[in-house]
Regions:
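N-terminal secretory signal peptides that target proteins for export/translocation
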Residues: 1-7
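Intrinsically disordered, low-complexity segments enriched in Ser/Pro/Gly/Ala and basic residues
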Residues: 5, 21-24, 49
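Bacterial N-terminal signal peptides
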Residues: 11-23
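Scaffold/interface architecture of coatomer-like assemblies
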Residues: 27-371
Length: 371
C-alpha cells in the first residue's frame, strides 16, 4: 500500500451532500487553535507552575446501594482518503456505518477532526549502528510534523533500546520535544525491544481520553523483548491507540551502502521487520511508510500529520455485549444520508474510489462470574 502523498484538490459528493476535499490535504498545515482540552496523565514529575495534567474522572457520591453495570465501549479512530491519497474532510456522524462481526452498531460518540491530539513519538535509539542515524531522521519532525500541530495538542518523546525511556513527558511546547531529540547523542545498548516498548507506551496511554496515537520511528527488528509478537498483537487489539509506523530499514541500508559499510546489517531480516510494522499499523487503524532515501522523510512526516489531523473518533457499545474473550472483526463504511454507499467524485465529475482506515477489530474481554 503506497504512502499518502497526493496533492491534487478534489471534490466529494454523496447523494445531495457536498463534502469538499481540503486542498493539498496531505501536506496542509493545520491552523493554530486556542488552548483546549485537558492534558493527558503525566508520566514524570511536572513543573508545578505548568498546566496540571488531568486526573481521572471524579467519582459521584456513593448512595446507600450501588448497582454497577460494566458496558464495554469500542473506540475507533478513522481516516478516509481517495484512491489518490486526498483526505476526505467534512464527514458527519451519519456518514459512518460500523459493523461488528457484520452487525450494524449505533455510534454513541463522535468527534470531528478538530479534536485535540495526544501523540507519543517513539524512537528506536540503540547502539546497533543505526540509532544515531534514526535520531538524525527524527529531526525532520521539527520542520514537517510539528508545524501542523495545534496549541491544544499534546506530544511526548520516548526512546527505546533494551528498555523504554521517557525523554520528554507530555507537553504542548513542541520546542521542548525538539530539544529532546537534538540531545540524543550516544545510544546505549544494542538491543531494540520494540514489542516491549510498544506495550509499555500503550499502557501509559490507557487512561488518556480522546484521540491518541503512537508514531513509531524504527527498523521494526525486535531482539530480546519479554513479549512475543502474538502477545503484543493481542494487547494492541485490546487498546484504542492508533499506531503509525515509519520503517527506516531501507533508508539505513541505502545510507550505509553509499557510505561503504553494511557489515552485519545484511544478515538482518528487514522483510520480517517491515511486515511487523505493517501489522502494528494495519490492525490499529494506522498506516506504515517505508522511505528508501532520507530526502523522502519530510514528505512522509507531512503525510503522518495529515492522518493525525484528519482522524474521526467514533465510539459504540457492541450489541453483543462483547465479553466473550474473542477477536471481533470491525468494518467501517462511508454512507450517504439515505444509507447508500458514499459517492465520491472529482471536480470533473469522475467517480473516485476511496479507502477507509480504521482498526480491523478488537480483542473482547473475557466475562467473569456475575458478568
Amino acid at each position: 500500500m503506497k504512502a499518502i502523498l497526493s496533492r491534487a484538490p478534489l471534490a466529494v459528493l454523496a447523494a445531495a451532500l457536498a463534502l469538499p476535499l481540503a486542498e493539498n490535504s496531505a501536506l496542509a498545515q493545520a491552523p493554530t487553535g486556542p488552548q483546549g482540552g485537558a492534558p493527558p496523565p503525566a508520566q514524570q514529575q511536572q513543573n508545578p507552575d505548568s498546566q496540571k495534567p488531568p486526573t481521572t474522572a471524579q467519582k459521584p457520591p456513593q448512595a446507600d446501594v450501588t448497582i454497577a453495570v460494566e458496558v464495554p465501549i469500542v473506540t475507533l479512530e478513522v481516516v478516509a482518503t481517495t484512491q489518490h491519497g486526498d483526505i476526505i474532510p467534512g464527514l458527519k456522524k451519519e456518514n459512518f456505518r460500523v459493523l461488528d462481526e457484520g452487525v450494524p452498531q449505533t455510534i454513541t460518540n463522535f468527534s470531528p477532526t478538530d479534536a485535540p491530539i495526544t501523540m507519543v513519538l517513539l524512537l528506536e535509539f540503540s547502539s546497533r549502528g543505526y540509532g544515531g542515524f534514526f535520531a538524525y531522521l527524527g529531526r525532520f519532525w521539527s520542520t514537517a510534523l510539528f508545524p501542523t500541530l495545534q496549541q491544544k495538542d499534546w506530544v511526548a518523546l520516548e526512546t527505546f533500546d533494551m528498555r523504554t525511556r521517557i525523554e520528554v513527558d507530555f507537553t504542548q511546547n513542541k520546542d521542548e520535544v525538539m530539544q529532546g531529540i537534538n540531545h540524543l547523542y550516544f545510544p546505549g545498548f544494542s538491543e531494540s525491544n520494540v514489542f516491549d516498548a510498544l506495550l509499555e507506551t500503550v499502557d501509559r496511554l490507557k487512561d488518556v481520553k480522546g484521540k491518541k496515537s503512537i508514531v513509531l520511528l524504527a527498523s521494526g527488528i525486535d531482539t530480546f523483548s519479554k513479549h512475543t509478537l502474538d502477545q503484543t498483537m493481542k494487547q494492541l487489539r485490546q487498546s484504542d491507540v492508533t499506531i503509525f509506523c515509519i520503517g527506516l530499514g531501507r533508508a539505513y541500508r541505502n545510507f550505509a551502502d553509499m557510505n561503504g559499510g553494511m557489515g552485519s546489517i545484511r544478515e538482518l531480516n528487514y522483510l520480517q521487520a517491515e511486515n511487523q510494522l505493517k501489522t502494528f499499523s494495519q490492525e490499529t487503524g494506522g498506516f506504515a511508510w517505508f522511505p528508501q532515501f532520507t530526502g523522502e522523510m519530510p514528505e512522509v512526516f507531512q503525510s503522518v500529520a495529515a492522518f493525525l489531523r484528519h482522524q474521526y473518533s467514533l465510539s459504540y457499545s457492541p450489541t453483543s455485549g462483547a465479553k466473550d474473550g474473542k477477536f471481533h472483526k470491525i468494518k467501517v463504511e462511508l454512507v450517504a444520508p439515505d444509507g447508500a454507499p458514499l459517492t465520491v467524485q472529482d471536480q470533473k465529475g469522475k467517480k473516485q474510489k476511496y479507502q477507509v482506515y480504521a482498526r480491523e477489530g478488537y480483542q473482547a474481554p473475557k466475562g467473569g462470574v456475575g458478568d
